[in-house]
Amino acid sequence: MPITAQQALQRTIEHREIFHDEMLHLMRMIMNGELSPAMTAAIITGLRVKKETIGEITAAAQVMREFSTKVQVPDRKHLVDIVGTGGDGASTFNISTCAMFVAAAAGAKVSKHGGRSVSSKSGSADVMEALGIHIHLAPEAIARCIAEVGIGFMFAPNHHPAMKNVAPVRKELGVRTIFNILGPLTNPAEAPHVLVGVFHPDLVGIQVRALQRLGAEHVLVVYGRDGMDEASLGAATLVGELKNGQISEYDIHPEDFGLAMTSNRALKVDTPEQSRDMLLGVLRGQPGAAHDTVCLNAGVALYAANVAESIAAGLALARAAIASGAALAKLEQLVARTHALA
């Protein structure tokens, strides 16, 4: 007998795991809108309080992938997603979105999966629109952008239509739930290389192991120890890496790469327009904390994408991509191509 919603809720209250096949069934009921908003809210809150297991998260991600509108990308050699869970409360400018242009200019293919702001001042979709990028493209058009420009942006609501059954519940609850954790695990192009920023150190090990179970090849999950869901200049960064089937955890420090330790206060923004202006400043080569933070994160992404042999080598490629103007040119190409394909 499949698990009932009431049984699943009881498990969470008793701090017991919902097993893989049970979680598949439960998640399909949620995605199909078969549960009432009250029951959905109770279960996802119960999971959060209990703490979701890697098995529960992996099963939920499998169902979200099953229900998603895919983007088919034939050339997957250096295909990478640069994504954050959000929820770090830092209200920084869109570092991973900026790093995407830099990584693409240095040779990665970026399939960026993102949405509007939930907890920050500016989500990736918000800043992309502020930059003039058309974010509502058909899957075939996104695949062409990846092939021709090296970047494709997948606006999450367009690829996860079943999430409409959960969206009102998430909004009303206003707290982090399993769905914050699932975003980086449900890239519609199923990129084999991933850089994920997370909002809590416990998620480093969870995300890297979930991505391993979901078939990823080279993954770096990062948590800035100052609370940032990015590789940070303000503190050490905890890294969980999956490479050649092996998982390792270690810290990296700005000084390891010749970067100055600096507070993230200078990276804070209040609107998508401010985020856009800071992002453009970085791509135009303005020196400072924003430039160095983006170079570090693009360097990690280039290492994850197997374009660079190490984070340090990736950082050097990132700096060169900005200095040459190639990163800014990528942005201009993406604006033009998305409008041509719209």
Swiss-Prot record:
Give me the residues that bind anthranilate 2, please. R170
Binding of 5-phospho-alpha-D-ribose 1-diphosphate occurs at 84, 87-88, 92, 94-97, 112-120, 124
Any GO BP: L-tryptophan biosynthetic process
Q: Which residues bind Mg(2+) 1?
A: S96, E230
Positions annotated to bind anthranilate 1: G84
InterPro entries assigned: Anthranilate_Pribosyl_Tfrase, Glycosyl_Trfase_fam3, Glycosyl_Trfase_fam3_N_dom, Glycosyl_Trfase_fam3_N_dom_sf, Nuc_phospho_transferase
Name the family. Answer: Belongs to the anthranilate phosphoribosyltransferase family.
Q: What is this protein called?
A: Anthranilate phosphoribosyltransferase
Q: What is the organism of origin for this protein? A: Verminephrobacter eiseniae (strain EF01-2)
Its lineage reads: Bacteria, Pseudomonadati, Pseudomonadota, Betaproteobacteria, Burkholderiales
- The coding gene here is trpD
